[in-house]
């Protein structure tokens, strides 16, 4: 029986929190926070990070090919796969963005 009482008390507390949240004033969503970065900035950073990963992988592969000491084949392969996966993920994001743009453009006005 005490579980039923605890459950009822929990439900009452949740409803009270819901009412408080609904009655609280909501901030204006049009103004962007000073420290917040835009989607374009975040996308640009992602593209730059993928480019850096590919460049590091290429440099590691070149160092292995010329026989530089301390470079292991497993490190080269892991770096190459990281670059490949990050590029594929970026390509998928691009495809989703293009598809979303096309869907929006095809909407009737």
UniProtKB/Swiss-Prot annotation:
One Pfam family named in its UniProt record: FliE
GO cellular component: bacterial-type flagellum basal body
Family annotation (NCBIfam families): fliE (TIGR00205)
Similarity section: Belongs to the FliE family.
Keyword Transferase: no
The name this protein goes by in its record: Flagellar hook-basal body complex protein FliE
Organism: Pseudomonas syringae pv. tomato (strain ATCC BAA-871 / DC3000)
Chief site of localization: other
UniProt xrefs under InterPro entries: FliE (IPR001624)
BP GO terms, sorted: bacterial-type flagellum-dependent cell motility
MF terms in GO: cytoskeletal motor activity; structural molecule activity
């Amino acid at each position: 029986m005490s579980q039923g009482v605890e459950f009822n008390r929990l439900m009452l507390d949740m409803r009270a929190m819901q009412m408080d949240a609904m009655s609280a004033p909501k901030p204006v969503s049009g103004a962007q926070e000073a420290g917040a970065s835009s989607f374009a900035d975040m996308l640009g950073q992602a593209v730059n990070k993928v480019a850096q990963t590919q460049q590091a992988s290429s440099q590691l592969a070149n160092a292995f090919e010329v026989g530089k000491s301390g470079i292991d084949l497993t490190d080269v392969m892991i770096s190459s796969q990281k670059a490949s996966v990050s590029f594929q993920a970026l390509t998928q994001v691009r495809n989703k963005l293009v598809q979303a743009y096309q869907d929006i453009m095809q909407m009737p006005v």
